Regions:
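C-terminal region/appendage detector
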Residues: 1-241
Length: 241
């Protein structure tokens, strides 16, 4: 089954809007009664790996601080991103004020210390402003809006109250609140309160949902067997689901 549907399963839902921000790519998937609505799917070619590289650039380009050392590899950057970065609720205002959170200090593998200021909230901002990484596509919240606008009004209203976050790049502090603010702004005249569901374990929600779904006897008709895979190939998964 699609990872968007499985993320919904982890929250006990068969219908909803799944917003997945992972390592290599981010997705928006509208699901109704366990089926992904293909015309409403959206893709953002930007996720955690891009944010790590963005953080590296931010650290190297600081004029008033020593640049990040070459020893700051992918593992250290990922640790730095996950432990100290957050999503701002008002990016422009916080950028003017150099951040509302205190600076953080991080020791690199070679023993040097780095101080992080505005890099803490500038790192994940491209999820909402892809143009910061020279991408012309809309932000994840705007793609969610496009997906919802592609649906009939009654279904759109239902899904606005069932928005589920998943993936490691949705784990930034402030990410759920920012997403809720942005979507409420996009749909302020809809007369529906946007509800964004963010489990503390949402980083592995798709895996959890897959485990739950596979344990249900009612889901067995959707399994792709080894014989089917050998007969039809990997593309058959799109026929089954």
């Amino acid at each position: 089954a699609g990872s968007g549907f499985l993320s919904l399963c982890a929250h006990g839902r068969l219908s909803g809007l799944a917003l997945e921000a992972g390592a290599a790519v981010s997705h928006v998937t509208a699901v109704r009664d366990g089926r992904a609505l293909r015309g409403a799917g959206r893709r953002l070619p930007l996720a955690g790996e891009h944010l790590c590289r963005h953080l590296q650039r931010l650290l190297r380009e600081r004029p008033a601080e020593p640049p990040a050392p070459p020893a700051l590899g992918k593992k250290a950057l990922t640790q730095l991103k996950e432990q100290y970065c957050y999503v701002s609720l008002d990016y422009e205002a916080e950028l003017r004020e150099e951040g509302c959170q205190p600076p953080a200090r991080f020791q690199t593998p070679d023993g040097r210390w780095l101080t992080l200021g505005k890099e803490r909230f500038c790192c994940p901002e491209p999820l909402f402003r892809p143009q910061l990484l020279q991408h012309s596509c809309p932000g994840l919240h705007q793609l969610a809006g496009q997906s919802l606008q592609a649906l009939p009004e009654h279904l759109r209203r239902h899904l606005l109250g069932n928005i589920v976050l998943s993936g490691g790049s949705s784990m930034f502090p402030g990410f759920p609140e920012r997403m809720c603010l942005e979507l409420n702004s996009l749909f302020q005249g809809a007369g529906v309160q946007v509800e964004v569901l963010a489990s503390p374990k949402r980083g592995t929600a798709a895996w959890t949902g897959g485990s739950m779904a596979a344990s249900l006897t009612s889901f067995r008709h959707s399994w792709m067997t080894k014989d089917e895979y050998q007969e039809h190939g990997a593309h058959y998964v799109h026929v089954k689901f």
